[in-house]
């Protein structure tokens, strides 16, 4: 019965809209009629306009007006056509400059966008845009949209900085805002997810903090945190907010996080004892677990920044053992960076063996750290001249393949590691395979690549070879899925405006822009040469017409126009 029911549902989904109960059976022919009328509307208007002109030809004196226009056109001199050509070239050049600026800023042609969005429906292009609810085209559109959403998923930066002690100090020094509103809004949503639950109304301090996480103004959030501490001196989330946003040094932030840890552990033990009483208590335990893990992780990051790296590694290992389900927080990336700072490369390899798995999501930290370890074994003795003369060894081939794998996953990282682009403070959220992830990785890992002698040299010699293996990265990848086309838009939302977002693959100018540029330039050049050297250009044009139009009437007519141009030019010169 279950299988039979499943087949019935599949048949109902694949059936046409008219055969599915509950759908309007007249929807299909109405849409088709509307599309047909839209397609023939332009032709009907054209025929009606011709008929109206024929009926009004005598009252409007169309014949006399047409004769006057003909006389006016015949009286125009060649100088007028030269000036007209120059003016049209100037206008076309201005249009080209605007088109180039629009394409450079928005990544699309303005004329093409207007044509597709506004002119195509008027020219009868609405039929192709109408698809039935169960048609394959509609299914493909839905599948593509779901794929784009999954590709453009934004992740919280595992190594994000402290707002008060790092981001705000940067603003004080440079006057620039390193975080965008979109990035901070995502952080506010994360805080509400991690630090709030349905039982917050039971404790007044949690109610105040629930409002504080939704507050946009930083001073108002800090004020709300102090109000929560007045109501409950053991409010862990209030200490977390103060450590993140009010503390101006890492030492102050660590002190507040230690107070938060003391309060968070007490609340966590109480929640563990009551977790089986009701679903609300289970939700409260999940919230208190998130708070405790967040506090310990930030304490580990404080210890890492203050030079107590072994202490930071111990805290991270304990977290990963105590809360293994929370791998989504990517604590292993914090651990990898700390182990690299200790130069504990065997431990780094052990972590990679666990997390660089085909079933787990990849990241720039995973791929580039794996490439760094393989590069480390050969980079010291690597020489491009020697390699080209004797060929690559097995270890060198493995290192080059690891670099190609990492570059395919995120092609923006090498420019930052090789210092071809300047680094900025990483955002609080990153887009995997995007420029934001590249900045976040290079900001913390550049020193580890510099520490290994020859690693950057090997990277510089081999990273561009990746692009020969994936000539069409948006359509087909080599080791990963095709590169998502939505990274540029998402990165522009995550990164500040003063940063030049890296784009991959490089967008080429449309053929229309190249054609417009060539046409405008050549027309303007011909107009200038004709104005300055009428005799030479006349001989050149006569030769061209002789090649393409060998009829005698064409050359004789052109000679008359050339003689008129010469006589008028002489008359102007003598005057």
From Swiss-Prot:
This protein's GO CC annotations: membrane
Top-level taxonomy: Eukaryota, Metazoa, Chordata, Craniata, Vertebrata
Entries under InterPro entries matching the protein: ST7, TPR-like_helical_dom_sf
Region (Disordered): 125-147
Family: Belongs to the ST7 family.
Species: Homo sapiens (Human)
Name listed for the protein in its UniProt record: Suppressor of tumorigenicity 7 protein-like
Keyword Transmembrane applies: yes
Localization in the cell: Membrane
């Amino acid at each position: 019965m279950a299988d039979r029911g499943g087949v019935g549902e599949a048949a109902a989904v694949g059936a046409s809209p008219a055969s599915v109960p509950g759908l309007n059976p007249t929807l299909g022919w109405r849409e088709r009629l509307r599309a047909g009328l839209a397609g023939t509307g332009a032709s009907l208007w054209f025929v009606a306009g011709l008929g109206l002109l024929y009926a009004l030809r005598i009252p409007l004196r169309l014949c006399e007006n047409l004769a006057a226009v003909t006389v006016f056109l015949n009286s125009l001199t060649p100088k007028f056509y030269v000036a007209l050509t120059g003016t049209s070239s100037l206008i076309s050049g201005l249009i080209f400059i605007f088109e180039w600026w629009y394409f450079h800023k928005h990544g699309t042609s303005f004329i093409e966008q207007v044509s597709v969005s506004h002119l195509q429906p008027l020219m009868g292009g609405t039929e192709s845009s109408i698809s039935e609810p169960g048609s394959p085209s509609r299914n493909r559109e839905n599948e593509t949209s779901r794929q784009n959403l999954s590709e453009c998923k934004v992740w919280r930066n595992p190594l994000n900085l402290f707002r008060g002690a790092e981001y705000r100090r940067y603003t004080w020094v440079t006057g620039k805002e390193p975080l965008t509103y979109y990035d901070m809004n995502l952080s506010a949503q994360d805080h509400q997810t991690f630090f709030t639950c349905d039982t917050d109304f039971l404790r007044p301090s949690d109610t105040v903090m629930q409002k504080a996480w939704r507050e946009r103004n930083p001073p108002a959030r800090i004020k709300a945190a102090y109000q929560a501490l007045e109501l409950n001196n053991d409010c862990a989330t209030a200490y977390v907010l103060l450590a993140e946003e009010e503390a101006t040094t890492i030492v102050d932030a660590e002190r507040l996080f230690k107070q938060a840890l003391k309060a968070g552990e007490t609340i966590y033990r109480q929640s563990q004892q009551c977790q089986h009483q009701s679903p609300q208590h289970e939700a409260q335990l999940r919230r208190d677990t998130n708070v405790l893990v967040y506090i310990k992780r930030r304490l580990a990051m404080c210890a890492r920044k203050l030079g107590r790296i072994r202490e930071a590694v111990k805290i991270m290992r304990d977290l990963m053992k105590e809360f293994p389900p929370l791998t989504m927080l990517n604590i292993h990336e914090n651990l990898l960076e700390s182990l690299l700072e200790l130069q504990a490369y065997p431990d780094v390899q052990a972590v990679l063996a666990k997390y660089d798995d085909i079933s787990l999501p990849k990241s720039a930290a995973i791929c580039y750290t794996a490439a760094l370890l393989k590069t480390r074994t050969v980079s010291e003795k690597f020489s491009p001249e020697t390699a080209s003369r004797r060929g690559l060894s097995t270890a060198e081939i493995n290192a080059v393949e690891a670099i190609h794998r990492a570059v395919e996953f995120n092609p923006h990282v090498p420019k930052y590691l090789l210092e071809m682009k300047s680094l900025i403070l990483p955002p609080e959220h990153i887009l995997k395979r995007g420029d934001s992830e590249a900045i976040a990785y290079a900001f913390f890992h550049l020193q580890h690549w510099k520490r290994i002698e020859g690693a950057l040299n090997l990277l510089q010699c081999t990273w561009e070879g990746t692009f020969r293996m994936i000539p069409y990265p948006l359509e087909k990848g080599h080791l990963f899925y095709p590169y998502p086309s939505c990274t540029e838009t998402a990165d522009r939302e995550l990164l500040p405006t003063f940063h030049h977002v890296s784009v991959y693959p490089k967008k080429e100018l449309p053929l229309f822009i190249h054609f417009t540029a060539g046409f405008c330039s050549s027309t303007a050049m011909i107009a200038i040469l004709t104005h300055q050297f009428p005799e030479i250009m006349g001989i050149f044009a006569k030769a061209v017409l002789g090649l393409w139009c060998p009829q005698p009437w064409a050359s004789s007519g052109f000679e008359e126009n050339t003689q008129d141009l010469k006589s008028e030019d002489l008359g102007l010169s003598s005057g």
